[in-house]
């Protein structure tokens, strides 16, 4: 027998037992008469010790380095009260070693387990980084999340059905990863950005409730919460309304938080996209932060200060403020830093006013823009934001997009900087009623979610007449400022689907080429269907309390979409490329 117990499960109930443990040497202390070691495995750490009375065993133990892989056999002993380590789950006991087997000693480590290593080091030696208890715990949590999801789905009649990994390139927003075909030279498969069309086809096939823990691929610029390959909890249903889908998925997430964190999230509030953008400057608002954007264009439209009155009178403009309680303590240096910060979002500056005496109107303000304001304007402004003595008010005035983006980002930053954001809280919500379409950089319509999302209460003819005003029957689940899931009711009428494609600039020939199979399927008794997908990586990131998605993926890529451990991607073998009829335009570096 190579193991009788996991290291991390031993406790006082095992005192007197003979145990066999296998794992890694976590830490060594040689005190002369005794050698104390911490032995670690997947489930935790336990202290073992060697007595110098057994000379051969003591000598063998003396040669061990950290991260040596060993087996020990010994007796579980209760520690003296003074020696109990309350920081360790196994801190009430230790193991007197009687036999030692060294499976493999370790060379000097390229990582220091007790120090902060660079992310580059951690990714290059990922197999060592994953031995760290906090990393092991995160991946164990991930496994328990997927186990919970599978149980919930099974209990609610969902079928786990796999969809193809080699599929057809379709416009879903990001670039595809292409896979060349050897048999069909010059042609390429695409790795799926999501199982979207296949899960819709499964609903058309009558499977009613589908789910899949699905690997997805997107060739896009990466951020801290993005990876080129990621995992979705993918869900689709027939004959369920959007509120019914949301209720079922909300119940799952509430159950998951209760299971993993013993936290009751309560019933999720619901907010429209328009309200979220107006009040928080984001379609994924972090409700732990009490600060809000307040529109004041109507108050400032007649002031002589063109920086305010210009956008206030522009139909495409916006003037909004953020009141920061007790923000008068913010220094001029901090204000300058915030001014530079909002510049990253296109803002040309950041006006501000400190409220020294709310009852004194204009005279009670300390602000470089006070000279441009009247007493009546100031009083109306202070009343609108419910200002108090000691507050600071930040102003944003520009195009609607610039103000919304800049002030939304400033809200988050100030909330963090001043400790206003309650980092211990959980604040979930549903964001609903998204615009159906948005303009891209070239002024053309693009789908805000994807081209298969149904509009709310519109005929194809009405949609064509007013695409700008169309509201999608779409919904996102947001927790603490992270979009953890999103979905919609799908189009199940072929005419509506063709209409949406047309608005997006996809002509009939292109529709037939790229989506002919879908348009054909829609003709044969397609049922109403809806669904959504959760980001498993992002859910795990939230539940484990890390802010880097790479911490919850076993073998992640860098922000340059590279694997430092395996050196992927790499140049293709010339013979293999020739078989695929591929010639590269980039020369391999010598």
Swiss-Prot record:
Instruction: Mention one GO molecular function.
Output: nucleic acid binding
**Cellular localization per UniProt:** Cytoplasm
The record's annotation in InterPro entries points to:
Aa-tRNA-synt_II, aa-tRNA-synth_II, aa-tRNA-synth_II/BPL/LPL, Asp-tRNA-ligase_1, Asp-tRNA-ligase_1_N, Asp/Asn-tRNA-synth_IIb, AspRS_core, GAD-like_sf
**Enzymatic reactions:** tRNA(Asp) + L-aspartate + ATP = L-aspartyl-tRNA(Asp) + AMP + diphosphate
Q: Where does ATP bind?
A: 218-220, 227, 483, 535-538
**Which keywords has UniProt assigned to this entry?**
Aminoacyl-tRNA synthetase, ATP-binding, Cytoplasm, Ligase, Nucleotide-binding, Protein biosynthesis
Q: Where does L-aspartate bind?
A: 172, 218, 449, 490
Q: Name one GO biological process term.
A: aspartyl-tRNA aminoacylation
Please explain the role this protein plays, according to its UniProt record.
Catalyzes the attachment of L-aspartate to tRNA(Asp) in a two-step reaction: L-aspartate is first activated by ATP to form Asp-AMP and then transferred to the acceptor end of tRNA(Asp).
Task: State the similarity comment.
Answer: Belongs to the class-II aminoacyl-tRNA synthetase family. Type 1 subfamily.
Which HAMAP family does the UniProt record give?
Asp_tRNA_synth_type1
Describe the protein's quaternary organization and the partners it interacts with. Homodimer.
Descriptive protein name = Aspartate--tRNA ligase
Task: Name the gene.
Answer: aspS
